[in-house]
Amino acid sequence: MKTLFADLAGDLDGEPDHGTPLVLLHGLTFDRTMWRPALAALAELDPGRQVLTLDLPGHGGSPAWPSYDLESLAQAVYRGVGEAGLQPPVLAGHSIAAVIATIYAARYPASGVVNVDQPLQVEPFVRLVKSLAGPLRGPGFAQVWEQFEASMGIGLLPPAAQELLQSSRYVRQDLVTGYWREAIDRPADELATMTADGLAAVRDAKVPYLVVAGHDAGPEYLSWLNQMLPQASVTVWPGSGHFPHLAQPRRFAGVLADTAGWPETSR
């Protein structure tokens, strides 16, 4: 069923009595179609599972906003989940949407988070985008974005997955800098404190948390993550770049299927 869920374009499929519902959130500059290969496999592995896929504001069929902050984006997803009539869901978010999913789990009832290739330690990324603020907001945007895109490992994906991403790209300067505004403009220590507070809320609520990464983040990051979010587990799929859900869609569908019994979180 295709419709709008609190002004977010989306698809709602499955039945409410087939395990914990799923909410899938795409990464920046893409749209909800990126989940199609995994959803096709999920229909075989976990038939009838209730799944809501949403286009984030400014992507796909969802209208643009004058500005984007992550708290408001999480709130928009929460409104969409409510309008869809879902029980507390497991949220799977790719890239920046994993941050949105994590904020959701810190603020609203959630049954779990599947983080697709998004580090949660904000300082390295914040330092990087602050150093590139001028080109990002000026005529050098296209060149800078090419560098970011080159680091994603799209060429590691099967040809069909590469074509899917190319067909769903929404690379606009105002969109990228809008979603990155807080990282560019707000002090790094302030963002680090916000992250720590959010992770503390997820930790205290004992929300199940799984990271599916395309590369090993290293022992220092894993030690930090274990301290901040002890219940988080990390699985690395080497050679899948920034898109492990597209590199191995059936394996990722298995990950989603395994969340069917994740417990609800009372709040």
Explain the meaning of each model-derived region.
Residues 4-63:
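Conserved HGGG/HGGXW glycine-rich cap/lid loop of the alpha/beta-hydrolase fold
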Residues 34-36, 62-68, 125-127, 222-223:
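Conserved catalytic-core motifs of eukaryotic protein kinase domains, centered on the activation segment
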Residues 102-106, 110-145:
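Flexible "cap/lid" loop of the alpha/beta hydrolase fold
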